[in-house]
Structure formats: structure tokens, C-alpha cells
């Protein structure tokens, strides 16, 4: 019994807080063991004796790591000994403290919550020392410390960490600014933390945070821009603070003052925030629990886990703000596999539904809903992931039966936020929501929207609000079956401020200058043109009860009372009549005589002929003739008629050859405008320009319908007059772009994007004409290329390749193609395979794209590497290609891409390949003759990607290992390669000799190089011991960096086995003997 007590007393840790039931894990045991070992070795020694002894010990990798961790343990547990220990560590460390930084990173990421108070204070002390002396990779430790500074936590322990990190950043600001990623992470974190520090007791800390953050944002705004839309979401919550209010003014009204390339708030909102920044706002422990909940807990068994999570992380009033961080993380980071989606694991929407429905704070609840729908507001199918919008629709769809209050509240919020989030760009917000819903239906995330949008459990007011906001997705109840899937969708008719129905109750306008409202104002919105904020009262948002998602059935929750039928209900009206009923009818205005008659006829007859007659009168009308009221009257009626006369379905011709169908498809009044512009290209008066501008702004389909019109018009005119060839008049399209103050390149991409979403067949039909008529814009245009690749199938790719082969279409030119390939590395696998098919169809020579070889990674870019390998097989090895290949980073297990290329070249031209590599290796050493060095040509990129000697040796070593049973070993036995290896051995340090001892052993003994090894035995005799040391060294070097890589990066992996060197050594000796005999 006494022995057990003594044993337990011995194991009391000074570094970790442990309870009686805690078991030590590998990390804790490692630190304790290293400390005990160090104490045994240095006990009773003087400083000099300790340094001498430790200097001998650290030569071996294992002892070096053990001693380093032991010293780190002393620093963290003994404040009095910390300065002396830090000095000792700098004397004995032989890797720039890499081992210490790697283990400290692991300690902070995995065990920070278990550190004693002394250890946490000493952690800050050692971090300050590391930053002061600019120790490499210390930013990894600081980033993990930032993660431990949790949101929604105002405990003394958390505030100490926050303030300590802030002091380090302020004191060493110059060092901080050298690391853009750390600048971004610190700004994102502190803007989030400032929100939690509103308590008057924390005013001094909050003021210090505000001053530092604002200063860093303004000084380093070019680094802040990539933070994207979630950074704007965080800025909204602190917008009432005077310094942030001024920042908002500059963002909204004077963006160029922040950075010359910054174009305003919409610039930020279009950028998706990186997962790393969303991740940094969750504690590592919390992240692990969340991953467990979303990947291991079965649906129906989650209640006890949710209760535990609630008690652990949502116990204080301040912790409610954490829900938004969790929802953003779940939506953007946790993307389950198909197998998980088909399993009985709890889905993401259920976790999010629980987080929202269990929130009792109205401000936090509104912010949580915004987090759920935030990606909807800016959704672009070309760039954004459907997984980011899927939870929003599913939580509403699956809650409507058992939790109708959750669904109704979320639908109400979505309707109101669409209109009021950013009034100035309401049209773009609506387009984002429209794109989201359309893609949800196209991908059949849910069968259709009818059970949700027209559920009898929704109250009448909400159903009207849904119909008003999502009229494109609402159909007459009487004509729609219960589970009908919407087969077609009409072109979106954007809603504009002038036409918007102001039915939102209790809307108030608060003058806050430029200040976007803060979260504590109980509203969510962005500022409009008049510095007013249209606000949504949270009272109208908070209509749900506490409907907790659990394994219990929610049938007993409150139900919506059944609405009584009203004779005024327009549910039974056709949708077209509902739209007419809702549209405001402009009051009639007297117009000038020059246009009054023709305009009246056009309004009455609504056809292309009367429309073109009116345009002829209106085009020459001077600005002085019309006042603003008259002009608005003309514009409103015109846009209304043009929109209503366009067919809701089948806007394009069903046949591409039949003249009757083609002519009918461009017979509507909007095409009359295009025909008029086609025939009248000279400059028009200001009223006509205003009319044209408004039509383009309000009818988003104008641009692509004009492209369609030009294709049909030219086709029909050419058939009428076969002797004359009619071409696109790009000047007409340019006129449309100028009317909207847009650049033709961006307008073209936008219009083609909309066209592809509306009708892929017509888009592909127009594509050759686009590349021919807009070739300066279209060729090598990555945006247009991405639109094409996302919609093509195998037959479409075949047809495009036919057009390229026949010379009818050119997608790429050699100059700039490499930039297209670089950007395509982020595309989906199928899209990249299609891209390489198109590149091959252009017969692009390898030399135009070979510079990208060093940039490609085996783990991340398999598509590009696969196709480049096939291209390399058709090439002969050259100095330039080999230089680029050997510039590639050689991972711990080699580069299979380089090995494969060398292997198939060895089969065809082994001697030439050996000479090129030998020449490149020889040129890396000072004793080599300058005349023998292969100098790059003027057009090459030698300066940027020249391999070092270690790079070349690494690739040769991994190639050696791949040559099992001696196959392919002839590369090493040629004269130049033998001399190159001997020269490399002569000029290498001991570490390199040990690392590549097996490779150097392939160079046969040469008496002429014996001077390079004076006094030493031959390499063949030294090899066995050297091989063992080399393996130990390589393993130790890899271990030092594996800890940080596991947290901060991901490594590539490939499988290449080592091989027996016996046969290759024999081959080398035979080759050398033959040379000597011939001499």
C-alpha cells in the first residue's frame, strides 16, 4: 500500500493538471520521460561539464530530441530556471530549435487545456523569446495559441491568453507583418473576440484590441482582402464602435483609400473565406467533438451528446455568440462523403437545427440564421460548392412536419434578409438566392419546393411573403401534385428597388452615418445609398419556440392553426394573374408630341413593329424635351412590356436549322431593340441611352439574348443573300456593355454564365462564334473556360475538338496558356481531363507549358501530372526538361513522376539521359569547369527553378531505389555520371555523404579522385556503417518536421521500395574495369 502511494506521488506532473482517473497519453509520457532522462544526465555537473556532455549526446538524433524536450519541460515548469535553460538550449540545439518548436506546437494544439497555470504563463514567456530571436516556424505555435483563445469565453484563463498574444503582436509588430497568414489570422480572430468584450470591466482590453486591429487592417489591407465575406460578417457585429464605424465609411464610400486594388464591399463579399480562418475560431478540442458528432453518432442517439456539448460550451450568456462560428464551420468545413450521406449518421442539417432552435438569445439567434444562409446571398455555381447551401434547405425541409416553427422562422428570415441585407445590391443578392434554389432543384437535393413553400403549416402572411420573394419557384396549388419535381424554370425576373413592394412591417430607418449596424442593435442589414440602414426587428424574426432536435418525436410541439379560406385569397389564381395583381400600375403621364403617339401605339399593341417605330422617334429626342417624371414613366412601362412579352418557357428556338422556328424565336419586342441597334450604330441622345441602360440593368437576360439574336440574325440574312456573308456586329454588344458601365470582358463572361445556366445547348451552339468574334477576350479566358468545362459531356468535348481540328475554333494560344493551366489545378477532376483534351487538340508543344513542372504536387495535381507524363513520353530528354524535372521537390519517399519519366527515357536513350543529368550535377560544384556547365537559353526560367545539388542527388537516390533487381541501373555506369558522382562525393559535407552513401557507392574507385578523400578508406569499404548512420539521420530529420506537418500541412505519399545494390555495384565495377582495360 505504501509502495503504491509512493509510486503515485512520484508521477505527480508539474506540467499537466491531472486527476486521479486521468491516464497519461503518449504526449504526456514523452515529456515526463524526457525530463527525467535529462535530470539523470546533468545531475551534479557543472555548467561546463554539462555543456560538454550534452554536446556529445546531441550528435545522435534520438538523444537530441529527448534533451530538447527535457529543456522545454524545465522552461515551462520552472520560471526561475527558464532564462538559464533557454541559454543552454541555444548552445546545444543543432537544428535551429526545430524539435522544440515542433513539440511545442503539438503541446499547444493537443494539451493546452491541461497545462498548469505556471506552464501557461511560461508558454507566453518562451513565445516572446522565440519571436524576439526570430526562431523559425514559431508562427505555427502562435497560430495554435490563437485557436486556443476561444470565442464566447470571458474567463480569466482565456482573457490572459488573449491579452498576452495581443501584447506580443503589438511589441513585435514588424515581425508579425512579415507573415501575411498570421496577419490575416490575428485580424480575423481579434475582430471576432472584440464582440465578446463588451463588458465595461473589459473596456481597457477592448480598446487595446480595437486600436491594434484597426491599425493592422489599414496598414495591411492588401493582406486583409483574402479574408472575404466572413470577415464582413464579423465587421457587422462591431460596427457601432467608432473606429470600426469610420472603417465602414471608408469601405463603403472611399475604398481606394484602403488599397488601390480594392473596389468596395462587394469585392469582399464575392470572396469565399478560407476554411483555415473558420477553423481558427474553434477550439481544437471543440473541433474534435464536432467531427465526432458528425461522423460517428447515429441519428436518433444524439441527444445525450448534444446535452453534454450544451453544458460544456454554452453554459454562459456570452457563449451564445459561439453558435455562429460553429454553423459556419459545419457548413464550410465538414463535408461528408457519399457513404456517410447514405448512412444513419446524424446529418449536418440536424446539428445546425439543434444549434439554432436551442438558442435563447435573440441577437445570437439572428446571427446564427445569417450564418446558415450567408453563402446563399452570394452563391455562384461556377465557384461555390453546393455543400455550402445544402444544410439551409434541408433543415427547413425536414423540420416542416415536426418542427414547423423552425421552418417558418427560417423562411421568414430568408425572405427578409434577401431584401434588406444590402439594399444597394439587392438584385445581386436575389440572384445569389435564386442560383442557390435553382441548383438545389437541379441537383435534386430535395424533390421540389412545394411541400415547404406552400405547406399548410405556414401562416398566410408568410406564404404571401414567400410568393412575393420566390415567385419563380411557386406554382398554382390547384395544378401541382404533392411531389411534383419542377421540370423547367423561367428566366429570373429580378426585383428592383423602384418596383419592390414595401410590405415588411415595422421597418425603421436609422441614420448611422456609414455604420453598418452591430449585432446588439437586434437587426441585420447593410447600409444603402442614403447612409440609412433598413433594419429587421428581431421580434419578427424570433417566432419559434424552443424546438430541440433530439431522438424524441416532436409531434407534440405547437402546430400552426389551420387558416380559414378567404374569398380574397389568390392561391387559386393562375401565377400570371398573381403577378399582374402584385405589380404597381404607373399613373399615366403626358409625353411630348414627338413620341406620344408612337408610345401609345406600342403600349397598346406590344409588338416588335410598334416598338421599333417608337425607338425611331425616341432615339433622336433631346434630353431637354423630357423631364425626369416622363422619362421614368417611359422606362417603367417599357421594361414591364418587354419582360411580359418574353415567353416564360422555350425562349430559344427548338430547331437550329428551320428558318420559321429561328425567325419566330427573335420576333419578340426585346429583339426589336437589338435589330434597331444593329441598323443604327451612330451615337444616340441621352434619353435613349438612359432607356437602354435601364433595360440592361432590369432584364438580366438582355446580354445573352443579344448574342443569341446576332447568331440567328446573321444566319437568316446569309440564307437570304448567299453571296454576302453577315458577321456579328460586336459593336452592338459593346454598346450594351457601355450602357451598364461594364467592361466588355466581364459582361461577356457574366452573360455567357447566365446563358449556360439557362440553356446549355444554346450556349455550346454559340461558343464557336464567341471565340471567333471576341477572340481577344475569349482566347485563354479562364472564366469562360470554366463555364464551358462545367457543362460539357463527352459528346460536347468531341464536337469542340472537331471544331478545333477544322480550324473553326481556337480556345488557346501558346502565350499565356500556362496561366490557364495553373488556374485549372483547382477544377474538378472531370473538368481537368476535358481541359487537357482540348489542349492536346491544339497541338501545343511541350516547351510552352513545361515551366509548370516544378509547381505540380503528386497529391494535389494528379490530373495535370498524368497528362504531362504522356506528353513527356513523346519527347526526347533535353537539358531544359531535365532541369525542370529535377527542380521538383523530392519528398521523403521520392517523386514517382520524376522516377517514371527517367525510367521510360532510360529504355530509349540511356546514355544521353545520363550525360544530361551528369552535366547538371557537375555544374553544381565550384571545381567544375565553367565551360562544361550547361547554360540555360535566354527564354528559359533557369533563375527561378534551378535544382540544387541536393535536389539532383535526392532524385538520383530515389531512382536508384526504384530499380529493383538491377533493372534500369545503366544510368549510373556511364563515364560522365561516374565522374559526376565522384565530384559530388568530393565536394559534399559529411552529412550529405552519409545521406547518399548508397548512391555514392555506385561510383567505382578512381585513382585520379583519391586526393578528394585523402587519408580515408574507399567509399565501398565505408558504406555499411555509413548506410546505417544515413538511415538514422534520415529518420530523425523526418521525425523533427512530421509533428508540424501533421498540424500545418499535408505530405504526399508514394510507395517505392529500396533495392539491393549488389547487382548495380557489380555493374559499376565491370564498367570501370572495361574502361581501365581499354586505357
From Swiss-Prot:
Phosphoserine: modified positions: 1049-1050, 1054-1055
User: Which keywords does the record carry?
Assistant: Cytoplasm, Nucleus, Phosphoprotein
Q: Where is the composition biased (Low complexity)?
A: 938-949
Residue stretches of biased makeup (Basic residues): 1062-1073
| Localization in the cell | Nucleus; Cytoplasm
- Would you name any one GO CC term? nucleus
Q: What is its main location?
A: nucleus
Family annotation (InterPro entries): HEAT_Ints3_C, INTS3, INTS3_N
Which region ranges are annotated with the description Disordered? 544-574, 925-949, 1010-1079
Complexes and interactors? Belongs to the multiprotein complex Integrator, at least composed of IntS1, IntS2, IntS3, IntS4, omd/IntS5, IntS6, defl/IntS7, IntS8, IntS9, IntS10, IntS11, IntS12, asun/IntS13, IntS14 and IntS15. The core complex associates with protein phosphatase 2A subunits mts/PP2A and Pp2A-29B, to form the Integrator-PP2A (INTAC) complex.
Concerning its family, UniProt says: Belongs to the Integrator subunit 3 family.
Function description: Component of the integrator complex, a multiprotein complex that terminates RNA polymerase II (Pol II) transcription in the promoter-proximal region of genes. The integrator complex provides a quality checkpoint during transcription elongation by driving premature transcription termination of transcripts that are unfavorably configured for transcriptional elongation: the complex terminates transcription by (1) catalyzing dephosphorylation of the C-terminal domain (CTD) of Pol II subunit Polr2A/Rbp1 and Spt5, and (2) degrading the exiting nascent RNA transcript via endonuclease activity.
Q: What is this protein called?
A: Integrator complex subunit 3 homolog
Q: What is the lineage of its organism?
A: Eukaryota, Metazoa, Ecdysozoa, Arthropoda, Hexapoda
Amino acid at each position: 500500500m505504501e509502495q503504491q502511494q509512493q509510486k503515485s506521488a512520484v508521477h505527480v506532473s508539474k506540467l499537466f493538471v491531472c486527476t486521479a482517473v486521468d491516464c497519461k497519453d503518449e504526449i504526456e509520457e514523452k515529456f515526463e520521460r524526457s525530463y527525467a532522462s535529462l535530470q539523470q544526465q546533468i545531475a551534479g555537473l557543472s555548467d561546463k561539464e554539462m555543456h560538454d556532455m550534452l554536446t556529445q549526446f546531441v550528435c545522435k538524433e534520438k538523444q537530441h530530441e529527448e534533451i530538447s524536450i527535457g529543456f522545454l519541460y524545465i522552461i515551462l515548469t520552472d520560471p526561475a530556471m527558464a532564462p538559464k535553460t533557454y541559454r543552454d538550449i541555444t548552445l546545444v540545439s543543432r537544428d535551429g530549435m526545430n524539435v522544440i518548436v515542433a513539440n511545442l506546437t503539438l503541446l499547444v494544439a493537443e494539451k493546452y487545456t491541461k497545462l498548469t497555470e505556471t506552464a501557461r504563463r511560461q508558454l507566453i514567456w518562451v513565445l516572446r523569446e522565440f519571436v524576439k530571436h526570430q526562431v523559425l516556424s514559431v508562427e505555427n505555435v502562435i497560430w495554435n495559441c490563437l485557436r486556443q483563445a476561444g470565442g464566447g469565453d470571458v474567463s480569466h484563463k482565456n482573457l490572459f491568453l488573449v491579452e498576452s498574444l495581443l501584447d506580443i503582436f503589438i511589441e513585435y509588430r514588424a515581425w508579425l507583418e512579415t507573415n501575411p497568414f498570421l496577419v490575416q489570422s490575428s485580424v480575423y480572430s481579434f475582430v471576432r473576440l472584440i464582440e465578446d468584450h463588451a463588458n465595461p470591466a473589459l473596456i481597457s482590453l477592448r480598446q487595446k484590441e480595437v486600436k491594434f486591429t484597426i491599425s493592422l487592417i489599414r496598414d495591411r489591407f492588401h493582406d486583409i482582402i483574402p479574408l472575404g465575406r466572413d470577415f464582413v460578417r464579423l465587421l457587422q457585429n462591431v460596427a457601432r464602435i467608432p473606429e470600426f464605424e469610420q472603417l465602414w465609411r471608408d469601405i463603403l464610400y472611399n475604398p481606394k483609400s484602403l488599397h488601390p486594388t480594392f473596389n468596395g464591399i462587394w469585392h469582399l463579399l464575392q470572396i469565399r473565406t478560407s476554411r483555415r480562418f473558420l477553423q481558427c475560431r474553434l477550439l481544437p478540442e471543440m473541433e474534435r467533438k464536432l467531427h465526432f458528432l458528425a461522423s460517428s453518432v447515429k441519428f436518433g442517439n444524439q441527444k445525450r451528446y448534444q446535452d453534454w456539448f450544451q453544458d460544456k460550451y454554452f453554459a454562459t450568456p456570452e457563449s451564445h455568440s459561439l453558435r455562429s462560428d460553429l454553423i459556419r464551420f459545419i457548413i464550410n468545413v465538414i463535408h461528408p462523403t457519399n457513404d456517410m450521406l447514405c448512412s444513419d449518421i446524424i446529418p449536418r442539417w440536424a446539428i445546425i437545427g439543434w444549434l439554432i432552435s436551442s438558442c435563447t438569445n435573440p441577437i445570437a439567434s439572428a446571427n446564427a440564421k445569417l450564418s446558415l444562409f450567408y453563402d446563399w446571398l452570394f452563391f455562384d455555381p461556377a465557384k461555390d460548392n453546393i455543400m455550402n447551401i445544402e444544410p439551409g434547405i434541408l433543415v427547413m425541409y425536414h423540420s416542416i412536419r415536426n418542427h414547423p416553427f423552425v421552418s417558418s422562422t427560417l423562411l421568414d428570415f430568408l425572405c427578409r434578409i434577401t431584401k434588406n441585407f444590402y439594399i444597394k445590391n439587392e438584385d445581386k443578392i436575389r440572384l445569389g438566392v435564386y442560383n442557390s434554389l435553382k441548383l438545389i432543384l437541379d441537383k435534386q437535393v430535395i424533390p421540389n419546393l412545394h411541400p415547404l413553400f406552400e405547406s399548410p403549416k405556414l401562416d398566410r402572411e408568410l406564404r404571401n411573403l414567400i410568393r412575393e420573394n420566390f415567385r419563380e419557384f411557386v406554382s398554382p396549388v390547384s395544378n401541382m401534385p404533392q411531389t411534383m419535381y419542377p421540370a423547367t424554370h423561367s428566366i429570373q425576373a429580378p426585383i428592383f428597388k423602384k418596383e419592390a413592394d414595401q410590405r415588411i412591417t415595422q421597418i425603421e430607418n436609422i441614420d448611422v452615418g456609414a455604420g453598418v449596424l452591430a449585432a446588439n442593435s437586434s437587426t441585420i442589414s447593410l447600409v444603402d445609398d442614403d447612409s440609412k440602414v433598413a433594419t429587421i426587428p428581431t421580434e419578427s424574426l424570433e417566432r419559434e419556440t424552443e424546438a430541440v432536435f433530439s431522438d424524441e418525436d416532436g409531434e407534440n410541439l405547437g402546430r400552426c392553426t389551420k387558416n380559414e379560406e378567404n374569398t380574397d385569397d389568390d392561391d387559386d389564381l393562375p401565377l400570371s394573374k398573381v403577378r399582374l395583381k402584385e405589380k404597381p400600375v404607373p399613373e399615366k403621364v403626358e409625353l411630348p408630341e414627338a413620341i406620344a403617339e408612337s408610345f401609345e401605339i406600342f403600349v397598346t399593341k406590344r409588338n416588335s413593329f410598334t416598338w421599333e417605330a417608337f425607338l425611331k422617334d425616341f432615339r433622336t429626342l433631346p434630353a431637354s424635351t423630357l423631364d425626369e417624371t416622363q422619362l421614368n414613366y417611359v422606362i417603367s412601362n417599357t421594361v414591364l412590356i418587354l419582360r411580359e412579352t418574353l415567353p416564360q418557357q422555350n425562349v430559344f428556338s427548338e430547331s437550329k436549322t428551320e428558318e420559321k422556328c429561328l425567325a419566330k424565336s427573335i420576333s419578340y419586342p426585346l429583339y426589336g431593340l437589338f435589330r434597331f441597334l444593329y441598323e443604327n450604330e451612330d451615337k444616340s441622345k441621352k434619353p435613349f441611352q438612359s432607356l437602354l441602360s435601364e433595360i440592361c440593368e432590369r432584364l438580366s437576360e438582355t446580354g445573352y439574348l443579344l448574342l443569341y439574336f446576332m447568331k440567328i440574325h446573321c444566319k437568316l440574312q446569309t440564307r437570304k443573300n448567299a453571296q454576302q456573308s453577315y458577321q456579328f456586329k460586336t459593336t452592338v454588344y459593346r454598346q450594351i456593355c457601355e450602357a451598364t458601365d461594364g467592361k466588355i470582358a466581364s459582361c461577356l463572361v457574366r452573360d455567357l454564365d447566365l446563358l449556360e445556366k439557362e440553356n446549355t445547348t444554346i450556349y455550346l451552339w454559340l461558343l464557336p462564334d464567341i471565340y471567333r468574334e471576341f477572340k481577344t477576350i475569349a482566347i485563354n479566358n479562364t472564366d469562360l473556360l470554366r463555364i464551358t468545362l462545367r457543362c460539357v459531356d463527352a459528346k460536347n468535348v468531341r464536337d469542340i475538338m472537331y471544331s478545333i481540328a477544322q480550324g473553326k475554333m481556337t480556345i488557346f494560344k501558346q502565350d499565356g496558356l500556362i496561366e490557364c493551366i495553373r488556374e485549372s489545378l483547382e477544377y474538378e477532376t472531370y473538368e481537368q481531363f476535358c481541359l487537357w483534351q482540348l489542349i492536346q487538340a491544339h497541338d501545343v508543344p511541350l516547351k510552352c507549358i513545361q515551366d509548370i513542372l516544378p509547381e505540380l504536387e503528386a497529391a494535389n495535381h494528379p490530373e495535370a501530372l498524368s497528362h504531362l507524363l504522356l506528353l513527356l513520353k513523346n519527347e526526347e530528354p533535353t537539358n531544359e526538361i531535365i532541369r525542370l524535372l529535377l527542380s521538383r521537390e523530392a519528398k521523403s519517399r521520392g517523386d514517382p513522376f520524376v522516377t517514371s519519366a527517367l525510367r521510360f527515357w532510360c529504355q530509349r536513350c540511356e546514355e544521353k539521359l545520363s550525360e544530361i543529368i551528369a552535366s547538371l550535377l557537375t555544374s553544381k560544384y565550384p571545381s567544375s569547369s565553367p565551360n562544361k556547365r550547361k547554360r540555360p537559353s535566354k527564354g528559359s526560367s533557369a533563375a527561378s527553378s534551378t535544382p540544387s545539388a541536393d535536389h539532383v542527388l535526392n532524385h538520383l537516390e530515389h531512382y536508384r531505389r526504384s530499380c529493383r533487381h538491377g533493372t534500369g541501373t545503366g544510368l549510373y555506369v556511364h563515364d560522365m555520371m561516374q565522374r559526376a558522382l565522384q565530384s559530388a562525393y568530393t565536394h559534399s559535407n559529411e552529412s550529405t555523404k552519409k545521406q547518399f552513401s548508397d548512391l555514392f557507392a555506385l561510383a567505382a574507385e578512381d585513382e585520379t579522385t583519391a586526393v578528394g578523400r585523402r587519408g580515408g578508406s574507399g567509399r565501398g569499404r565505408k558504406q555499411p556503417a555509413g548506410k546505417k548512420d544515413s538511415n538514422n539521420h534520415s529518420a530523425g530529420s523526418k521525425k523533427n518536421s512530421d509533428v508540424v506537418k501533421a498540424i500545418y500541412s499535408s505530405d504526399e505519399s508514394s510507395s517505392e521500395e529500396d533495392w539491393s545494390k549488389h547487382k548495380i555495384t557489380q555493374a559499376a565495377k565491370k564498367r570501370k574495369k572495361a574502361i581501365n582495360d581499354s586505357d
